[in-house]
Amino acid sequence: MLVTMNDVLPQAKKGHYAVGLFNAVTLELAQGIIAAAEETGSPVIFGTAEVLLPYNSLEDLAMILIPMAKRAKVPVVVHLDHGLHKETCLKALKLGFSSIMYDCSTDTYENNCARVKEMADIAHSYGASIEGEIGHVGGAEGAATAEQQDDAAKFYTTPEEAKDFVERTGVDALAIAVGTAHGAYKLPPKLDFDRIHKIANTVSTPLVLHGGSGLTDEDFRKCIEMGISKVNIFTDINIAAVSAALAHFTDMGKGIIDLLPSIRDAIKVSVTEKMQLFGCCGKAGIAAVGMPDEAMIRRIVEEVLRNRRQ
């Protein structure tokens, strides 16, 4: 069932668990993620980031992920993560993505608010949900490793900023900077759990943890306990897939087709472990009903009218 973040994250916030976003930039990743979600009865978020589009275009991913989400026995959000350009976000919405993130966090705070507000209005007109970010999560999305910066705390999100940003933009989910970084860590991360708790008690909008790969199980549990409702994961499942491919190629010495089952199984196992850790197993049944029919009808009508004017 194709849904938006609004159908799964408010319930997660209320129930003190988190829904995982797993980057699904290949068919095998998507199959492993769906298999884990259906087996555990978990809501799940398919993700791809703009920096990952050279590996698979939005058009190709839309043809794979959206039909898979609609056929799934559990709620599935199809989300553009870290959309860096307005044009990319608009393309994702037109292709049928049910959710986007417009990441303007490296811009000035005022520009971040203005740009995300504009995109939030557009996303909501499509019946889609939108995520924004304030502060700065270190490292690069899709990177293999992340450096920990000693002065990173100056980029952390404050409760006051979070409240102001949510009120001014109308985002449906808020990514906050609390000490994580994209990619695997060279040094242990320094997470500010108290900051998460204060922000969660200041805003009603579900909070998102980026840069989750490489954290300990206890780190995840504590973050969710403090108020995180969505966790983004890529490095862990990416490494699991590569490790399985390498191991089975060494054993069998065969071609890519022979490796695919082991790759999908490794992804499924890795995602299942994260879902159990996040506490979302068995929570698929309490999600809302999915993208509203009225919103989908409005999108179709608007698209037809645009085509007639061209």
Where are these regions (language model features)?
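Alpha-helical scaffold segments that flank or form the walls of functional sites
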Residues: 32-35, 265-275
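Alpha/beta enzyme core
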Residues: 3-15, 25-52, 58-75, 82-203, ...
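Flexible, glycine/charged-enriched surface loops at secondary-structure junctions
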Residues: 126-133, 253-264, 279-293
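Short, glycine/charged-rich beta-strand-loop motifs at protein surfaces that mediate ligand recognition
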Residues: 207-211, 228-235, 260
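Glycine-rich beta-strand-to-loop/alpha-helix junction loops that act as flexible
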Residues: 179, 210-213
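Protein-protein interaction and targeting regions used for scaffolding, dimerization, and localization
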Residues: 276-310
